[in-house]
Amino acid sequence: MSYGGGGYGGRNGGGYGGGRDGGYSNGHGSHGGGYGGGGGGGYGGGGGGYGGGGGGGFGGGGDRMSNLGAGLQKQDWDINALPKFEKHFYKEHPDVTNRSQAEVDKFRREHSMAVQGSDVPKPVETFDEAGFPRYVMDEVKAQGFPAPTAIQSQGWPMALSGRDVVGIAETGSGKTLTYCLPAIVHINAQPLLAPGDGPIVLILAPTRELAVQIQAEISKFGKSSRIRNTCVYGGVPKGPQIRDLSRGVEVCIATPGRLIDMLESGKTNLRRVTYLVLDEADRMLDMGFEPQIRKIIGQIRPDRQTLMWSATWPKEVRNMAADFLQDFIQVNIGSLDLSANHRITQIVEVVSESEKRDRMIRHMEKVMDGKDSKNKILIFVGTKRVADEITRFLRQDGWPALSIHGDKQQNERDWVLDQFKTGKSPIMVATDVASRGIDVRNITHVLNYDYPNNSEDYIHRIGRTGRAGAKGTAITFFTTENSKQARDLLGVLQEAKQEIDPRLAEMARYGGGGGGGRYGGYRGRGGRHHGGGGRGANDLPMGGNRRW
């Protein structure tokens, strides 16, 4: 969706689409309306949905094909022959200049901030100190933010200085604005796009959900500058994305596979890219995108400015930074060791597989106490089938639950996310694919129905709550089949000074047993109540005994 014209669903009007009475109906259900149903250009209907795009699963199932990019020509860059571009915009505010090194060190300590590299600029403590032009500041102040977050305080001066930057910070730390606002300044300093030009700013993201959220921020803050953008990702038709690219966009937010598809078919080029962002770099590598990322970066001039953002700093991410960034400066917020957000209360219960559903209902009754409850709970399960089974079970028991996973169509996923965000359906069941990149405010509880494959995924899952300074609660069911993960989990809990279930400590001490398997040994049995799974769990009418 390029900025300009039309309702929320694209250039061609259409707005939000569909009636609001029924559940998701995909345009053919019996609930009257549905979400974007009828094809008249609703949220995802018609051409020009929320960002368009086709092929690939949840974040690009098709994005993982290693032969993607085989048709791209290797570029032989002559730096001296390339047009010059401007990337140095930072002018230190007098208040920042006058701050002593001792004051700077104190500020960094208070915000758990560490920096590395040569000539790292001092952090800013207010929006005005960042020195953004008025057209940017007006948009920021209109949002009512009290002060920059820690990553913004240090990241803005770094990005505006034109340097290559690495930022390591937990999800929900405000990193999107850390690179989006300098991107807007960067664009406005470059020559206007000519016909046939590709984007000036390229942002690579691992999943379509994260890409759409980044697009929303760029649209919001780039509005006054009339900056055009598009989202390029798999799972939806290519037509709207191709139209946006052919009309010209200053910003392209993309998942790697679909972007390579567009490059190979000549629908865009990266010759004008001078500001490159790799968001959630660790997640992109986890998902196997490194070959595609390397092919894409090979199409971009080497004197570009590159910013890499990651929640963790493993060897693979360090290697990528060394390969693609030059003389970079780095900011870390919090510990580089694997650790959970300390604002999250972590409750781990050692249970048998057959106990899970009853335990879940018990927690739901506490969390969702009364219709006036403002709580939102995100439930993680190990497989798509179990996601549907649990959703059916909850709906039949009177709970307003919806599920999201890779087999859902894009417009259904958008609808589910909207219902969850607005609180109309405050319970969402998700597979791991939703654990990163979905930015839903005010999730108060995360419930790990199935324990994930490793402690990194555990930390990313529970990081959906306790964001932006809020507190949260994470409830986790842990079985003997997960015992190989017990020692790592115990370390995470101890680091965050959480209460330890004695049975978990015993498992960690003796280790062994069970385990293996993609999801810590979980076999997808779904406990003793088999809800039948299958398609259409989100369509199922809620049981007569409404629990919320």
Swiss-Prot record:
The keyword Oxidoreductase belongs to this UniProt entry's keyword annotation? no
Show the Pfam families listed in the entry: DEAD, Helicase_C
Q: Which residues bind ATP?
A: 169-176
Q: Where in the cell is it found?
A: Cytoplasm; Nucleus
- Where is the segment annotated Disordered? 515-548
Tell me the ranges covered by the Helicase ATP-binding domain, including all copies: 156-331
| Motif Q motif boundaries | 125-153
- InterPro entries for the chain: DEAD/DEAH_box_helicase_dom (IPR011545), Helicase_ATP-bd (IPR014001), Helicase_C-like (IPR001650), P-loop_NTPase (IPR027417), RNA-helicase_DEAD-box_CS (IPR000629), RNA_helicase_DEAD_Q_motif (IPR014014)
- Provide the E.C. number(s) assigned to this enzyme: 3.6.4.13
Q: How does it assemble?
A: Associates with polysomes.
Q: What the protein does?
A: ATP-dependent RNA helicase involved nonsense-mediated mRNA decay and ribosome biogenesis through rRNA processing.
Q: What is this protein called?
A: ATP-dependent RNA helicase DBP2
